[in-house]
């Protein structure tokens, strides 16, 4: 028998907690015998004293086990259960292509995704731009669609990692969000409760990333790989660039449109293709569906080009309540804004930098994201046909197309983009994918 305040005192004094102490505290969080004040104090002691790797693993497992942990064994999928998670960015629509691509190669991807957070877009918000798409199916339907389509992307249910919900809500209002131990446990407790065999973590770097520096992103990636493997789930991470919008679009319906066009081979943004392929290839190698990265990439290009990946996406949409003919008639189903016109730079010159975070906030300001949890989303608004870093902005080459509801909204968005995209000065190229981090690299 432990006392929450004694566990807090021990951590406050810089000592390492045992797995039993951490389990006791997190069970108390889940059953409400630990108060919000105690959660806040616990989070702050971790913020100042950090956790050892065994403590991080114990915290992650305790939060994972605070609710239901899905067991897929009765489904007899007949292939590896794999998933990926991204720390989030702007125009990061990779999940919508990645799930079907891996499914078409023989993997099973039961993906539990989130909504937009701050400046980052949410996979669920994008999918809800598809009429009828149900992000909260029963567990039976979730499993059935995963089995039939190879992929199902849904929202977090209340019975997965409930302790994380309480801890996160308290961290959000006590300035303890940006701590590697707490971020690691929060991300992984939800993901590992979904019954995965392996996981690929896409950690973003740059002006639109969650972590402020390359070093912080690398530290988070290493923590996630070490903790997830320690908790029994094979995991690797990739560090990818978020110094500019990843896709050619940012918003909800505009990103779904780009994802469908990507899967059908109508248009594939080269950066989006590279980052998506990097994550998918890791998933195939981890799931033993490919010998190595080269083999994986060849298989992935094949399912993109022969239409099998697009077919898996269509099956998922139909299985979760969306239109059965969505892939053929997607443009008729996705909401469109009344005003779609370009914005130009105020001067001609090379695009040398993007404040990607500010571009994400411009989407939110238009109604394409939430300022508070109760806000509703306008699926039609956003941007597409983005200029890339290193390209020349001119009277012929706009910064982007703005999808707005009215002229005033268009003007506000135009001002935001002109301020966020720097024209002129030195442009230093950055790689799309910086590096992979595997267990043996730590």
From Swiss-Prot:
Its EC number is 2.4.2.4. One of its GO terms (cellular component) is cytosol. SUPFAM superfamilies: Nucleoside phosphorylase/phosphoribosyltransferase catalytic domain, Nucleoside phosphorylase/phosphoribosyltransferase N-terminal domain, Pyrimidine nucleoside phosphorylase C-terminal domain. Pathway: Pyrimidine metabolism; dTMP biosynthesis via salvage pathway; dTMP from thymine: step 1/2. Keywords: Glycosyltransferase, Transferase. Gene3D superfamilies: Nucleoside phosphorylase/phosphoribosyltransferase catalytic domain (3.40.1030.10), Pyrimidine nucleoside phosphorylase-like, C-terminal domain (3.90.1170.30), Transferase, Pyrimidine Nucleoside Phosphorylase, Chain C (1.20.970.10). It catalyses: thymidine + phosphate = 2-deoxy-alpha-D-ribose 1-phosphate + thymine. Transmembrane segments: none annotated. GO terms for molecular function: 1,4-alpha-oligoglucan phosphorylase activity; thymidine phosphorylase activity. The enzymes which catalyze the reversible phosphorolysis of pyrimidine nucleosides are involved in the degradation of these compounds and in their utilization as carbon and energy sources, or in the rescue of pyrimidine bases for nucleotide synthesis. Homodimer. This is Thymidine phosphorylase. It comes from Vibrio vulnificus (strain YJ016).
